[in-house]
Amino acid sequence: MNQLEQLRQFTTVVADTGDFQLMKQYTPQDATTNPSLILKAVQKPEYRHLLERAVQDHHGNGGVDAVMDEVLIAFGCEILAIVPGRVSTEVDARLSFDTTATVNKARHLIQLYEQRGIARERVLIKIASTWEGIRAAEILQRDGIRCNMTLLFSLVQAVACAEAGAQLISPFVGRIFDWYKKQAGEQWDAAANGGDNDPGVRSVRQIYDYYKKFGYPTEVMGASFRSTAQILSLAGCDLLTISPELLEQLAGGQGPVVHKLSVDQAQAANIARITADEPSFRWQLNEDAMATEKLAEGIRLFAADAVKLEKLIGEIAK
């Protein structure tokens, strides 16, 4: 068995891409998208028609906002024709500090999916793991709208999401790794910070262990990988969402895959509970320079790509 096949024995494999033609060969269970991945996909000739059709059908009726939503849903529906499970569709990052607007947008996206015959159980609404986003997820989950909490870089964010009843979280491995590597500069020791000691891997393992120790049902889906080594160090995580490039490397890899994360190990671990009410959340996040900076940066980057997509829509609509 190749490494991808071995990994599937321990973990649900998810494709992290808007390029739905490319994901077919890896037969993922679920798929995730984000504004950056959708922007990248619509710039390819083979997906241009989805953008043009959305502009043609909706620009005169609802403007750019309606077209943006239609593009997200169009990609989601195409992906759901390929994967047997769920697709993650992201709420505009510019709503990350507005609970009411996030709830309204999520409900609208689910309504659009349901109008196309897609059951809400097959859709995860991606929301940034700000305090306001987590409160939106709490409301949505009560409505039966499942949420995927993204841009998650710290244990306190993870605990707040679980206590809000979020369906799933996406802790970002690679971006955590990037931050620590950049901070270390020339002092970075690749060997000492690789494998199980990779700071991004350690963060996800800490969150996974906490959830399993205290019996939270929220799913943990490691995301944002820079290498297959990071992925294989998290074998056993509930889900891992992986880019096509890294899926290809795993499919070509022949080394053994070791089961790294397990419920039994987590439950046996000595872990202290933490408080994740609003004052504690804001303080602990503020104390974590990496998480604070990467959350802010991630929101800015996703928002910038949403603006680029709007400009692209405007050019086509002329």
Swiss-Prot record:
Pathway: Carbohydrate degradation; pentose phosphate pathway; D-glyceraldehyde 3-phosphate and beta-D-fructose 6-phosphate from D-ribose 5-phosphate and D-xylulose 5-phosphate (non-oxidative stage): step 2/3. Transmembrane segments: none annotated. It catalyses: D-sedoheptulose 7-phosphate + D-glyceraldehyde 3-phosphate = D-erythrose 4-phosphate + beta-D-fructose 6-phosphate. The active site is at K126. Its EC number is 2.2.1.2. The keyword Nucleotide-binding does not apply. Signal peptide: none annotated. GO terms for biological process: carbohydrate metabolic process; pentose-phosphate shunt. Keywords: Cytoplasm, Pentose shunt, Schiff base, Transferase. Pfam families: TAL_FSA. PROSITE patterns: TRANSALDOLASE_1, TRANSALDOLASE_2. The keyword Nucleotidyltransferase does not apply. One of its GO terms (cellular component) is cytoplasm. It is an enzyme of class 2 (transferase). PANTHER family: TRANSALDOLASE. NCBIfam families: PRK12346.1, talAB. Homodimer. This is Transaldolase. It comes from Cupriavidus taiwanensis (strain DSM 17343 / BCRC 17206 / CCUG 44338 / CIP 107171 / LMG 19424 / R1).
